[in-house]
Amino acid sequence: MAAFEHLVKSYDVGELLDDIASADPPAYLRRCFAEGSAAPALSWPRVQQLAVCAMVLDALINDRDYEIFEHELIADWRMHYAKACAKLKDSAVQALHRILERNRPEDPQAVAELESLVSRLSGAE
């Protein structure tokens, strides 16, 4: 899936995946979404981090393949963490809504990509 290029443009996805892998993936994602929802303001790199974490969650619980992710790593995480990560959908959607309400990107294509992530995680897509 070659989507979401506006959200991940110039973002080091590999480094984030390494950070998630070196931690407990469900705990890392939970913390990321909680911090994103609670922060008074979000920088563009922080918005990108939340979007990539939401993409990881979507890949794990909705069995989607994203071109930018290492497929073997995601397959391993699906096997071990899908059940625990399924509980994070609501917090991910809440964090993405928070971005759209308070830190809406200027790029309309990035906004559309965020809205698509919300739909995917909400089960509408």
Label the predicted regions.
Residues 1-41:
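Short terminal alpha-helical segments
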Residues 10, 22-25, 50, 62, ...:
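Alpha-helix initiation and capping sites
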Residues 19, 59-63, 99:
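Residue-level signature of the C-terminal ends
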Residues 27, 31, 51-55, 90, ...:
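Generic structural signal for well-ordered, non-membrane alpha-helices
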Residues 30-31, 63-71:
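Amphipathic alpha-helical scaffolding segments comprising HEAT/armadillo-like alpha-solenoid repeats
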Residues 44-45, 71:
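Catalytic toxin/effector domains delivered as secreted proteins or via bacterial secretion systems
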Residues 47-63:
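Short, hydrophobic/amphipathic alpha-helical patches that form generic packing surfaces
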Residues 76-125:
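Amphipathic alpha-helical binding modules
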